[in-house]
Amino acid sequence: MIVKIWDVIEGPIAAAECPEEGPEEANWYMVCRAEVDGIIADDNFWFEDFDDAYEWQKHFMKTIEPLIIDMSVMAGYN
């Protein structure tokens, strides 16, 4: 499954501040505008490391091009 991230709406935010439970190893999350199969919605994306999350934030400070993630190659997703 291909996910396109179009924008960071909010974050990085400490995972402890999230009302929903995320992955056990996640310390940070961001609310992002994402597209899956042509449908766009805001969703939470989880990160172990603040710097990894902030890389997404920096991407959108420079460009409006989406980040493209192939979830089929990520552990725990199919």
What would you call each of these model-derived segments?
Residues 21-44:
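A short, structured beta-strand/loop element
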Residues 37-55, 60, 73:
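A short, exposed loop/beta-hairpin motif centered on an aromatic-Gly-Thr core
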Residues 10, 29-32, 48, 59:
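Secondary-structure boundary/capping motif
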Residues 1-29, 70-71:
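Short N-terminal "domain-start" leader segments
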